[in-house]
Every structure is written in structure tokens, then in C-alpha cells.
Amino acid sequence: VIIQFGAILSVICLYWKRFFYPDSVKTGEKTYWKAMFDFYARLVVGTVPAVVLGLAFNDFIESNLGNVQLVGWMLVVGGIFMLFCDKIFNKGSEQTKFTYKRALTIGFIQCIAMIPGVSRSMSTIVGGMSQRLTRKAAAEFSFFLAVPTMFGATCLEVYKLISHGGGSLLTQGNNLVTLILGSVVAFVVAILAIKFFINYVTKYGFAAFGWY
């Protein structure tokens, strides 16, 4: 969980303009602070369901992480769904307004990924497409939504580790070096993967990932 912090940073690095200088500012559509508020408010709205339901069903989630049958079935169901999701949902429009209601709906659909074996990215992308976002816009918002969601999960796990007296494990032996190295590798690989993924799904859709 700690290593995924590198992947979180990769999203911010790739989309730093979206996080710190939204397009609506350049076009003069909104003032800087209005654009920033709208962007981050949508992230907060989309994250709230995961926070609430994640805390409520934390015991169920952790107790089923090792349920091989459940994970296996969910991978199969998710894969089949991805094979046909491009046909199920009509192509989104670039003119679709990304409202708070749409952000909240995507946030709730993201919670399906709390079932072990369900991909968080898949659930949020499908959520975006169900709200008539384009494949690219849905995929990008999935990555944006991963930042607060994964950061929160990382902080929670570190807190649990420290509160149970395991904080010394972070610095024991070569653990700290391993975590730092793992985070750097995750950062680099995530940047390459995100670039490839966005370009691929924009052109070809999600069927190949369903087979995967």
C-alpha cells in the first residue's frame, strides 16, 4: 500500500496542469480560484462514497481479500463486462457537462471495487461512461479519483501499522530503502502505463483489457 504512493505522484506529475491550472482558466471561462474549487470539489464529491462505505465495510473487505473463489469470479465477470462495455454504453460526448451529480454517481459506482477482484479503474471508468463521458474523459477522471482514494488508503494503512506498534518495521533493516525504491519504480512504471492506457482506450476501447 505504501509503494502505491509513487503511482499517486505519477498522476499528479502527468496532469499537473489539471491539478494546478485547469483549462477553463486559460479559456477565460472561469477565474483561477473558481476553476480550482470546481475541480477539487468534484474530486471530494466522488471520493466521499468510498470513504463512507470503505469504513463501513472494512471488516468484510479485509476478511475476503484471500477469498480466491470470490476474486476469481469477479475477475471473470469484470473481464466479460469490459469486452462489451463499449457497446453497452453509447459513445460519450465532449460536450457533456461534468456535474457534481455525475461525480457522485461515479463515486458510488467506484465502491463496487470494494469487492475483492473488482478493478477500481474499471468500475470508475464504467461509471464515467455511464454518465456519457468520453472514454478518454472517463479514464482520466478514474486516475484523478485514484489520488485521494489511494492516498487515503495509504494513510489509513500506515496509521494502522503505527497504532499497532509496527511503526519500527518501516525503518527495520533495509525496509525503508526497499519502500523508497519500490515507490520510485511504481512512479516510473505508472507514468508509462497511464500514457499507453489513455492513448490505447481512446482509439480502440476496452475489449483487449477484458481478455487480459
What is each PLM-predicted segment?
Residues 1-212:
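Multi-pass membrane proteins that catalyze or facilitate reactions on polyprenyl-/lipid-phosphate substrates
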